[in-house]
Amino acid sequence: MNKILHKRIISLLLVLLLAISCISCNARTNQETLQSRFDTFMEEMFVQKVQSDSLSLNYSLARPEQYGITMTEATFGRCSIESMNEGYSFTENQLSRLLSYDYDSLSEDQKLTYDIVKDYLRTDLSLGDYNYYYECLGPTTGIQAQLPILLAEYSFHDKDDIKEYLRLLPRIYDYFEEIIQFEREKSREGLFMSDAVAKKIIAQCEAFIADPGSNFLITYFNDKISRYSNLSKKEIASYQAQNTEIVLTRVIPAYQMLIVALQELLGTGTNDAGLFYYPQGQKYYECLAKYKTGSGKNMEEIIAMLDAAIGGGIADITTLTLSDPKIIDKYMDFRSFPITDPEAILQDLKTDIREDFPGTEEVKCEFKYVPASLADYLSPAMYLVPPIDSYQNNDIYINGSDEKTLSMIYTTVAHEGYPGHMYQCVYFRSQNPAPVRSVMNFTGYDEGWATYVEMYSYQYAGIDKNLADFLRANNIVILCLYARADIGIHYEGWDKNTAMKYVMNYISDATIAETIYHTLLEEPAIYLPYAVGYLEIEGLKKKAELILDKKFVTKDFHRFLLDIGPAPFETIENYMDLWMKNESK
């Protein structure tokens, strides 16, 4: 009897174990299925993003066919209220789909992607109530200013890319027509730009098309295509002729059309001051600041952070002045960094950063110079982000090849090259992150990192240490001053006199102060990603130093920031708390 009972108990236990095993197996299978579905969703989001226009696709992927992507229509995308509303509806749908996933069932990497994408989508949606406040034109970052460089650097991986480029280029006329219609609608809403900004854009367009036969998009294409090894002379001549005709009959007329339209709209703007003076301008600026910086701080906290940084920088300058009586003379006499050739600077930095920055794979970098027709309107330098599947070839544009420009180019190369944008981009791409992360725009992280390492690079420049510290502190003060005045103008409603008075507390030259005022007025929040992003990273570093104490290693902190990649700073801080727990063990 006992034997029979014993056998029954054993049988029952076996059945129970088998049932538990099946449940466990099913749970594991369900989790794997969910994770697979999540990866598919992220891939779909990536494909939808890069397929939105031909430039995005070309700059994102060298071989789109490997992702199953084909562009049936060459397009610059859309710029209309209808397309914006459609975009926000689509974003709402994507956010809803994202939130439907069980967070706890995702892998650790997927959780990071989830956190980042969720914040990105929510921030994007926050701008949806202010469509007419959006401005696609602008003296420095406007599409009409950026487009020539973006078109010139359109990648030709094979003949199909050349053909696609020549299909895309004439569409610029239709694209500008849509932009003009949008600007007319802004005018009717009382939200058109000031005359000063419009006149500056007009002058910029006029300079770009001043010499049609020698236009940058003709001369650069001719040189670029002639060096393409897989073409016959006949093909080269044919492509050059097609491009020249398109530039002369579609591109230049598009810019002429834009000039005429802006001239017609002169006088229809209702506000010559900051965004604050538009009906919803302050709220829009608040959303814009969050989008541009990736900071979770409110405006009052950002103001306090900037004020503290300015005060700290001035204190550092004062301390240096007291400890080194010759520091002002050193500063006034400073004319050049020891190395002035951009390629030599890049090589110097690649060697110098090894102690404090993790290694990454070797890539090629070509320095190019902004054409004269665009020089007065573009940034001092720019790094063109390469496709995610071809990041081994990189381009950095420098605005000016004269001796004066190059004499001060050292820290700019650090910002754009090593250990700045190019280094960060190559490092992140080499980690093989989810492709969708490469098309999420986190300017605060990107420019914050580049500004942080730009300031860091003064120690590598080969100049007197006190002078290096003085230059760094001075540049931090100036950068934060610009950002603080930007907030004053657009969020707090400073008028011209108030803004200039504030700037002249630090810069005594009234002409320079007025130039700063107009620059900030023209493109709201333009300096916030640099200043706020930099201060957020400095804040993270100080927190890590405080908590880890003797276990803090600069190189490991940099590796953490690079590993996590572009993201909102609240997310980065949350993950840094976990990283510090592991580091402190």
List where the protein language model places each region.
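N-terminal secretory signal peptides that target proteins for export/translocation
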Residues: 1-6
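Sec-dependent N-terminal signal peptides
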Residues: 7-17
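N-terminal leader/targeting segments and the immediately adjacent pre-domain N-terminus
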Residues: 14, 26-29
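C-terminal motif of bacterial Sec signal peptides marking the signal peptidase cleavage site
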Residues: 21-24
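N-terminal maturation segment of proteins
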Residues: 28-585
